[in-house]
């Protein structure tokens, strides 16, 4: 198993992606199906830390029609799909419908907890990471458990992530989606459109992995439909 994990990791890293842990589904869990129709026995999560995939994505995008919808999702599906085919797995995406419980899988695989923004807080990457897909296998692939990594939010007294948004989109009450969307699209939303979420950028952890402004602008445009 270790050899295969190393081979999968090597196949992913050429496109800036990494394995984000995994686990074996309990026998009584309603696991998703693999291509053959059988229930998957294990899942390996695929994602990114920081902006590592961005140059690879941009090179791919230059070769695609300008009208392609959801280009980052399309690129992720292609890259992870190729790896899945090479290793006899089924590739799935967070945007697949019906939606799969990716956040729950991530908690199980890496032992992370949500930040006040809902994004899982990573002890190294902070809020600057993402899950791009997963590989489902018909065999049991046992990985070491994640343990209990420190939850950095517990030690953060100031909580700047709840104090930086001009419309208080994030609070202890949750995410005010409509208020955020209206602000980003409006006349005062240029800082958010060009540099990303102010609350997310206010987080003091994992700053060396923070996405550059052009990447944050790309994600904000996708969120706001701009």
Model features per residue range: what roles?
Residues 1-226:
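Non-ligating segments of multi-cofactor redox enzymes
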């Amino acid at each position: 198993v270790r050899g295969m994990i190393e081979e999968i990791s090597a196949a992913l890293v050429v496109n800036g992606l990494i394995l984000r842990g995994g686990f074996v589904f309990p026998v009584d869990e309603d696991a998703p199906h693999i291509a053959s129709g059988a229930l998957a026995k294990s899942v390996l999560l695929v994602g990114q830390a920081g902006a590592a995939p961005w140059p690879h994505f941009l090179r791919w995008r230059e070769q695609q029609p300008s009208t392609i919808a959801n280009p980052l999702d399309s690129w992720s599906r292609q890259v992870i799909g190729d790896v899945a085919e090479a290793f006899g797995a089924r590739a799935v995406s967070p945007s697949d419908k019906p939606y799969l419980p990716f956040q729950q899988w991530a908690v199980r695989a890496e032992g992370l907890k949500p930040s006040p923004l809902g994004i899982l807080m990573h002890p190294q990457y902070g809020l600057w990471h993402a899950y791009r897909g997963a590989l489902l296998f018909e065999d049991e692939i046992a990985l070491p458990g994640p343990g209990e990594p420190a939850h950095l939010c517990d030690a953060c007294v100031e909580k700047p992530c709840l104090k930086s948004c001009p419309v208080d989109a994030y609070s202890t009450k949750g995410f005010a989606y409509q208020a955020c969307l209206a602000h980003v699209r409006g006349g005062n939303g240029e800082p958010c459109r060009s540099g990303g979420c102010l609350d997310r950028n206010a987080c003091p952890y994992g700053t060396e992995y923070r996405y550059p402004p052009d990447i944050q602008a790309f994600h904000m445009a996708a969120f706001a439909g701009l």
